[in-house]
């Protein structure tokens, strides 16, 4: 590195845990509300109370009837029942909203509305259902009552001077309802901090523009802004800034005149070109430079000379969201006078993981509820994953003092929401599947993960998931899926195999076939780079089976054949991933579905048809959503949809049980 680069390069200072970072900001007096203001009740939703609220009245403010019926003296109906009814004289009616002038004496009554003031002399209310009005002036009562029955007494709900809401309470529709009932029209609340989000990076483009090679669309700016809006913060997205220290410095300087908190995304790693640290240092004082978490280590927090918070999030989406969820939200809530508790669930780990002691790991998980147990299923993604934001139900938190988590252990999960999805579908990838789930009207009610057929099979064998899509070729029989279930006694006792549909696999290559590919054997050519599917996928099994046949026919070992294939270890996890690699010139040839090849305008040679079936947990068969899924597969209209997609076929037995 040259001298300038060495000067610019920053190493991380002492790394802090999430808790230590929050405590440091608190000890410096930075996590205090920024001010108070009074607002009209109709504008108070989502705000945080800056003072205790004491009731200015009794509630209810008067003794009132809880039912429609008759106001009586207890003595008048003593001993009354179906066999010994009492006849009372009706002396009028008390309507809601009016002050009664009637006084109830023994053997007299008055009809009364729900919510009306209790007239003098009445001890209770007989419900209308236990009476019979025989004349306009007489009523027969078939039930006795106890003192105070069906009466709500003044102050019985809330008493005059009672503490109703505490300072620091976030106002929801419930609090607004109570305040309105007490006649309170204005409340004193903490001011909401004004927050702005800025994305930094030369590689970023605005969604809606044509994506250039090597560029990515800005995810964090939109995702973090929306996430904070969902949490009720006053936040604005400012846009994308280039990796220029001067541009970022000047822009943030301007933003600090209008906002209380500036959040940046990107430009936070300890590399020579990352500039967030240097900009924050010029604007004020660095307080936190690096967290003991993975992902999320390159987080920067500073205080500007104006006393405003600068918060630098990492550039990778899952990393940024994890830190935003577990630390940034806490900071912003403290600035508006609120202290929340993170929604933590406990779930059984379905995976084993070794980690280094000294850092807390954040891992995206899908949550599966089967047989009264909650399972956490790891999504195998990187911190740069965008799909993890969509697929995950929460973040598994593996604390820094742990170096190993075993399958079956209980672990902490920071939940993204209150509700669990009704079913979990994990297994082989297929584009048509999500379209069918949408057509069945259940796409929003299921969690989906594409991990390959073998991993789906393993999760099903352990009883962790509801449905596993598979397409596994048995090399011995040439049959798909059924042999794997029949040979596995444990699996066959836990799941049934339901027929799905057929897909055409093709050998795909660039339009015009510039490499003059004629067949599968051409992937052995030294001038051709192959893109493979991930280990554990059904397509990988097919590829390796074909390569084994080639090895046998040429009297070579499988390992030797593999060593000679350029790109054999270049693995992607989806059919569209294969097609994209070819379309973008990162590979010359690969095996994918015909549909994926067409999406990327590739040429191809047909290889084989495979069955894409559904393994279903026997304990899930009674779930309404699983019944709806199977019914959808059996629907003749669904077969028409499947047959309408190039490279797909719907067999006559689609949706029927195959075994076991």
Feature locations, PLM:
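N-terminal segment of the mature folded domain
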Residues: 441-522
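Short loop->beta-strand "edge-of-pocket" segments that line small-molecule binding or catalytic clefts
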Residues: 422-429, 521-546
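Flexible glycine/proline-rich
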Residues: 15, 19-22, 37-42, 46, ...
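Short, glycine/charged-enriched hinge/interface segments at domain edges or termini
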Residues: 2-7, 11-18, 52-53, 71-238, ...
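Periplasmic-binding protein-like
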Residues: 491-504, 598, 602-631
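Extended ligand-binding regions for polar small-molecule ligands
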Residues: 504, 508-516, 521, 525, ...
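A ligand-binding cleft/hinge motif common to bilobed small-molecule-binding domains
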Residues: 469-487, 579-608
């Amino acid at each position: 590195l040259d001298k300038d680069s060495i000067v610019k390069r920053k190493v991380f200072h002492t790394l802090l845990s999430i808790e230590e970072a929050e405590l440091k900001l608190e000890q410096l007096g930075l996590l205090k509300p920024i001010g108070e203001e009074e607002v009209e009740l109709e504008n108070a939703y989502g705000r945080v109370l800056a003072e205790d609220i004491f009731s200015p009245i009794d509630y209810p403010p008067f003794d009132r009837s809880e039912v429609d019926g008759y106001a009586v003296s207890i003595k008048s109906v003593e001993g009354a029942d179906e066999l010994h009814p009492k006849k009372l004289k009706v002396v009028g009616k008390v309507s809601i909203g009016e002050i009664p002038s009637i006084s109830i004496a023994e053997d007299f009554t008055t009809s009364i509305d729900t919510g009306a003031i209790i007239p003098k002399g009445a001890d209770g209310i007989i419900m209308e259902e236990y009476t019979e009005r025989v004349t306009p002036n007489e009523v027969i009562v078939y039930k006795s009552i106890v003192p105070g029955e069906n009466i709500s007494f003044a102050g019985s709900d809330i008493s005059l001077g009672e503490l109703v809401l505490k300072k620091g309470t976030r106002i929801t529709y419930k609090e607004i309802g109570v305040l309105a009932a007490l006649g309170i029209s204005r409340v004193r609340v903490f001011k909401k901090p004004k927050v702005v989000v800025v994305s930094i990076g030369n590689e970023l483009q605005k969604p809606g523009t044509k994506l250039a090679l090597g560029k990515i669309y800005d995810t964090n700016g939109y995702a973090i802004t929306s996430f904070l809006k969902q949490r009720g913060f006053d936040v604005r997205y400012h846009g994308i800034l280039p990796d220029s220290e001067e541009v970022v410095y000047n822009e943030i300087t301007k933003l600090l005149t209008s906002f209380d908190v500036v959040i940046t995304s990107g430009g936070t790693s300890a590399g020579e070109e990352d500039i967030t640290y240097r900009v924050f240092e010029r604007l004020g004082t660095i307080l936190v430079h690096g967290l003991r978490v993975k992902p999320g280590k390159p987080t920067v927090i500073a205080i500007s000379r104006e006393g405003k918070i600068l918060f630098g999030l990492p550039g990778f989406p899952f990393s940024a969201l994890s830190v935003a969820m577990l630390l940034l939200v806490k900071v912003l809530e403290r600035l508006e006078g609120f202290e929340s508790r993170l929604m933590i669930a406990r779930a059984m780990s379905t995976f084993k993981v070794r980690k280094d002691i000294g850092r807390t790991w954040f891992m995206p998980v899908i949550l599966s509820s089967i047989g009264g147990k909650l399972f956490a299923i790891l999504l195998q993604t990187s911190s740069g994953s965008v799909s993890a934001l969509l697929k995950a139900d929460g973040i598994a938190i593996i604390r820094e003092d742990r170096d190993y988590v075993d399958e079956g252990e209980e672990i902490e999960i920071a939940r993204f929401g209150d509700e669990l999805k009704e079913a979990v579908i994990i297994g082989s990838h297929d584009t048509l599947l999500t379209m069918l789930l949408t057509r069945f009207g259940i796409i929003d009610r299921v969690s989906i993960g594409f991990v390959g057929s073998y991993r789906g099979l393993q999760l099903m064998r352990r009883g962790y998931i509801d449905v596993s899509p598979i397409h596994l070729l048995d090399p011995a029989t040439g049959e798909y899926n059924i042999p794997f279930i029949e040979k596995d006694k444990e699996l066959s006792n836990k799941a049934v195999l339901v027929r799905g549909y057929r897909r055409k696999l093709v050998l795909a290559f660039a339009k015009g076939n510039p490499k003059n590919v004629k067949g599968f054997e051409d992937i052995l050519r030294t001038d051709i780079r192959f893109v493979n599917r991930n280990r554990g996928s059904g397509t990988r099994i097919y590829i390796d089976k074909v390569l084994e046949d080639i090895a046998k026919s040429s009297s070579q070992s499988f390992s030797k054949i593999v060593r000679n294939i350029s790109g054999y270890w270049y693995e992607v996890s989806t059919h569209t991933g294969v097609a994209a690699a070819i379309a973008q010139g990162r590979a010359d040839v690969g095996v994918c579905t015909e549909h994926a090849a067409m999406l990327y305008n590739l040429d191809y040679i047909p290889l084989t048809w495979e069955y894409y079936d559904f393994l279903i947990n026997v304990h899930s068969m009674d779930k309404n959503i699983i019944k709806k899924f199977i019914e959808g597969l059996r629907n003749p209209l669904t077969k028409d949809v499947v047959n309408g997609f190039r490279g797909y076929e719907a067999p006559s037995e689609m949706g029927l049980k195959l075994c076991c």
